[in-house]
């Protein structure tokens, strides 16, 4: 027995344990290996930094730790997903309706000799509707796939390890902690490594940290934070160039990447706002249905009906309240919007996300590639003692500078020659900016800049043959090459050098001005310093350039230059200029950020890049708007230390990841509340997640954009995750709800607009659909209370809900926005509901009642024309429905057989049905707008006009088509009977136009409080 009890507790324990694990994962990467010496690391992992592990030891560790692979998360089986579509949300209501119908039919079959099949048909139709719409939604969602499969592709297949002193290739899954691993340019890193030796090694950490530049790797600890230090490389990042050797310090799920994967797959994801809305709506409708059903159940018992009859009535009323067509309408509306968004480059993976974007109140955007173009571009040059601006626009429509200066010719020569980047082959017809380059980001920026301004770099390099080169390294921070010159009369070699500006300047004694060498004096050094600070302050990456003609007597033609043991001068060179690069903002972004601001959406930048660069881009795209200052700006302006500035004075703030690490939840909340414009720089993946959770604590609906693996936890946690289609890693695409096919932030704004529009239009669609519920229910209620012949049958109700109302309801999804949707605040999910009490009151209490009157008017007209005046109908029901009574007298004394009476009754059903169609014309037109007059909005919605014609044609077809009297018990009507409901239709239109006029004249008045849904 004891065991059983423990089992009971374990799910709870597991839940708690899972939550603790997730909290651990949210903490920063705890790693100490980067601070240890190589010997300490080897001691800790019982390995040798020359020989590596022994084979037996490696096997032992592999058995202990398991393979070096990521654990796939539990996936939801397809059948469960299918069942969710069949039994989730709205479908439940229809299922209950169907079961009740079968129940009622069962009761009737058991108690009557000749039961009517209406309830059976209704049950079957309801079940069919749910199954068909369920399949449709399942198909839509099945197009999106699972999160982890992309992680699988990230595991490198082979790794080069050293065991017992021998190099060997092993499967990456067999790499264990303590293994000695070698990596070279082009390899994927097989595990987290502590570097013990490196030669020109650079890794691309962009998918992990968001840094666009390749990062140098060396054995020294350069930073306390393991993500920033140079002596650790991470599992599944790429080695771009050079070689390195390191000791494995973590494998599989314990690696930094593994933690992110676990974090992303373990996050609790809340319901989408629209799912919450639909749930709220179902509760409302069910409430109304049950209330009506129970009231009339009690009433019918008081009126003397038997228990069985009362139960049949109860079921009938509940079923009549179910809007059968609405599930399909909502699904189709969302699908249409998703298709429309796909045409505008937003691919929506899950249908409900379509609307989420519309209710978004905060967007946390990644910088690289989303707000920027994701290509380093030369932005400024400094030569001849002035700063020149380069063209950073995507289509080269920007500024140009004076290219005739001799200094620029020299500068472009250095930038083209002292550069290892080359265009990949076969791209001659492609525009320069679009070409692929082999080389790092800065060098390819220089290459493209020189190619655009000075013509072919390839030709330049062929004419000035390279004879020697020292590649860039982190100790001397420059790159140098020596070339023969193209001038046939000049036999001197040309030495060209580029690198960190202050290091380059230290090696120079002269400076080139207007093509003449001048001595480098203090004044020029100060000018250099100012230019360097100005460009650096713009968040740009600055490089210095210098050259030197080697004297011919010392370095004759054919001189053997030795780059290891340098046998030529590298001092007293001639400084030529600076060039600075930035990843420039995309053209459409500032406008998009402005639109977000006027739509009441807060845009927060979250990036792994440097604070200065982040701030510069934030100002460039308007995330920090003109005139808004950060604490640092205020301190600089007033010339006081930052600590003396009151943080409340600053509207904008730039927060560094290392500071964020020590913040409590309360401090984060305070920042989010008190600043309107926020930039988070140098953030880790875990911090991104913490920022998203902070915004959600404020009650915001958060959209997150990202492209790297590091973004996936935040993408998953956000209310809507938006991944990049071009630059995005597979992982981020899997975690997201929506993918921007053109990687452009501006597409998000389009998405917000579409999301807000669909919310408005769904409201209209639902208002339209629900209104016809009243003329469908009231006949049944009067049938019970006044004992009159049934005015409208079950089959006819289905013809309205699944026939005539469908196309018009869907056509409202195509309705254009009434006012500028993007000028209002985001909706508050707590107060602005999809279906609120006011909508129910309008649809049921006002418009619906007028519609019911129209239907009853036709009903009484037809019966009166046939001889049954309204006064004689009350209490006639029992005789009317009695098969044995074949001599029922009307108001004029004529006798009617059972069959004849039924023909008149079914003709009334048809007329009532047609009346509902006629009054629904007016309802459709008034539902086009919620505040504007229809005359302001116009009738531009072609689908809606088609819907009007379609429902009329369908009604006429059902009434006049031969054979319908048998199939659906619909009978042909006299043309004059079509016009009975016209006055009511007109009344609805006039009533609503007057209501909207009052709304517009008295905004916020009682009419708005009572009727504006």
UniProtKB/Swiss-Prot annotation:
InterPro entries: ATPase_P-typ_cation-transptr_C, ATPase_P-typ_cation-transptr_N, ATPase_P-typ_cyto_dom_N, ATPase_P-typ_P_site, ATPase_P-typ_TM_dom_sf, ATPase_P-typ_transduc_dom_A_sf, Cation_transp_ATPase_P-type, HAD-like_sf. Keywords: ATP-binding, Cell membrane, Deafness, Disease variant, Dystonia, Epilepsy, Intellectual disability, Ion transport, Magnesium, Membrane, Metal-binding, Nucleotide-binding, Parkinsonism, Phosphoprotein, Potassium, Potassium transport, Sodium, Sodium transport, Sodium/potassium transport, Translocase, Transmembrane, Transmembrane helix, Transport. Residues 1-24 are annotated as: Disordered. One of its GO terms (molecular function) is ATP binding. The keyword RNA-binding does not apply. Residues 99-121, 299-310, 783-792, 857-908, 961-975 are extracellular. SMART domains: Cation_ATPase_N. One of its GO terms (cellular component) is plasma membrane. The modification Phosphoserine is found at residues 37, 56, 218, 265, 442, 933. It catalyses: K(+)(out) + Na(+)(in) + ATP + H2O = K(+)(in) + Na(+)(out) + ADP + phosphate + H(+). This is the catalytic component of the active enzyme, which catalyzes the hydrolysis of ATP coupled with the exchange of sodium and potassium ions across the plasma membrane. This action creates the electrochemical gradient of sodium and potassium ions, providing the energy for active transport of various nutrients. This is Sodium/potassium-transporting ATPase subunit alpha-3.
